[in-house]
Amino acid sequence: MRTHFCGLVDETLIGQTVTLAGWTDVARNLGGVCFIDLRDHEGIVQVTVEPVAGDDASAELFKVAASLGYEDVLQVEGVVRARHAVNDKLRSGKVEVIATRISILNKAAPLPFHAHENPGEETRLKYRYLDLRRPEMQRMQRTRIKLVQALRRHLDARDFQDIETPILTKATPEGARDFLVPARMHPGEFYALPQSPQLFKQILMVAGFDRYYQIARCFRDEALRADRQLEFTQLDMEFAFVRERDVQDFVEDMIRAIFKEVVDVDLAAQFPRMTWAEAMRRYGSDKPDLRIALELVDVAELVKASQFPVFTAAADDADGRVAALLIPGGASLSRKQIDEYAAHAAKYGAKGLAYIKLSETGEVSSPIAKFFSEESFAALLKHVGASNGDIVFFGAGGYTKVSDFMGALRLKAGKDFNLVADGWAPLWVTDFPMFEWDDEAQRYVALHHPFTAPAVDDIADLRANARTAVSRGYDMVLNGNEIGGGSIRIHRPDMQSAVFELLGIGAEEARAKFGFLLDALNYGAPPHGGIAFGIDRIAALMAGTESIRDVIPFPKTTGAQDLMTDAPSPIAADQLAEVHVQVRPKQV
């Protein structure tokens, strides 16, 4: 139906007859001439219709052109000629196509929005097929496509094996809530959709496949936000007979090569490395954005002599923290803006936010100054590096909570004060804690997942020091986004059983949920490790958008709905009966 793509028609085709197909982006009838911007996935070319006096065929052609509306689907035949007025905004802007025939393949109904408009998100998602026609959306989807193609080429060339793993599998606790699928042939029993291929890829290492990858669809029934979806895509990888640096060096080279190929970005020749403890201490985050130069400063020792009980209690607590965040030029914040910072910190667990503001003339404004002697107050300001015109925020309380809300303030201040440097800041975060304590459940939970190997090989040592145990986990961070997470896995069945026990998973429960894994580890499992990269998140970074919904063709809303297909939706009673499911009536 076509000989060329619209966006690729150029000067080399001048004088030639071409057949094009696409959508009417814009149609303009200027009386004596019609101009049609014809669009396909490669871009736009101008089609010109010039009636010839006394020529019935050209008059009919002009009549067809004059009747066109937005998004009508056309086939156009014509001759390429040089344009009198060049349009530098188009690749085809030096030429136009003089139409000799126009066929309307399909008329478009009146549109809810035009391809060059940017309507509200609900409208965009309801008419996603129209939204995806917009040039910006085409660009972002193409970025994602190029990313996946480049990853496949890179791994195929290095002897990785692309192996599929099951979508219908066993429900196993991996942190988030499972999506469950009733098993019609086994009444009362359910499959789960995979949160990741984690256990299957480990078993593939036991099976001797050595190097595995998969562009895997994963499912987690969790709250949605800009960087999370119920279903998402990850590059899943696993290596046999490796240590941490083997995996890290390989995937660092891969990510560097992929960014160069897909978006022509040169990432650092060597990614900096930082332990989890250092990242939390300096930045209040295990995925710090290194483009922001601001750092947290511990001030517990300097506030112990104060008379402020919130500070002294946290400073004297072995699990407490008193941290300061200096914002250069922050004295410009009004009281209302300071209250907004306090409200922002409260979202992350802060019960209050102290501050010291120094005017350009050195005048102090602070609700906590009265609790310090003149000498200790001066020492505090010197320690944090405060100068006239600055503001210092303080957080006090439990170490983790203070780190979280002060880290959130750091990000807010970086954006508010234009302190986010241009460019790309990759980072390895290593040596994560093996466990974290869940106050509600009164037990340890795995910080990564239950299959991450501890840094120690001795089970007695792990049991005796579970609270401070370090794992062999690692994350790759880019511009404050965790784009990849991995670890060396547990390959010994006795160590895996011990970790289950520390997580409150008894032998009977472990056998019921993970018996297949424990059995596999018993039959000669090699040391192995891997990593998984979030395709959606990397594509969003490459495309320059903050929401992964922009790089997913058919995403869900934050309310977990597909507005285009109206999913989820009720199921007929006979279908429910077939899978032995009875739905409780909604509570009014």
From Swiss-Prot:
Keywords: Aminoacyl-tRNA synthetase, ATP-binding, Cytoplasm, Ligase, Nucleotide-binding, Protein biosynthesis
Residue segments, region Aspartate: 198-201
Enzyme class: ligase
Keyword Plastid: no
EC number: 6.1.1.12
UniProt binding sites for L-aspartate: 174, 220, 448, 489
Keyword Aminoacyl-tRNA synthetase (UniProt): yes
Catalytic activities: tRNA(Asp) + L-aspartate + ATP = L-aspartyl-tRNA(Asp) + AMP + diphosphate
An example Gene Ontology biological process: aspartyl-tRNA aminoacylation
Main location: cytoplasm
Cellular component GO terms, alphabetical: cytoplasm
Family: Belongs to the class-II aminoacyl-tRNA synthetase family. Type 1 subfamily.
NCBIfam families registered for this protein in UniProt: aspS_bact (TIGR00459), PRK00476.1 (NF001750)
Subunit text: Homodimer.
Name assigned to this protein: Aspartate--tRNA ligase
Lineage summary: Bacteria, Pseudomonadati, Pseudomonadota, Gammaproteobacteria, Lysobacterales
Gene that encodes the chain: aspS
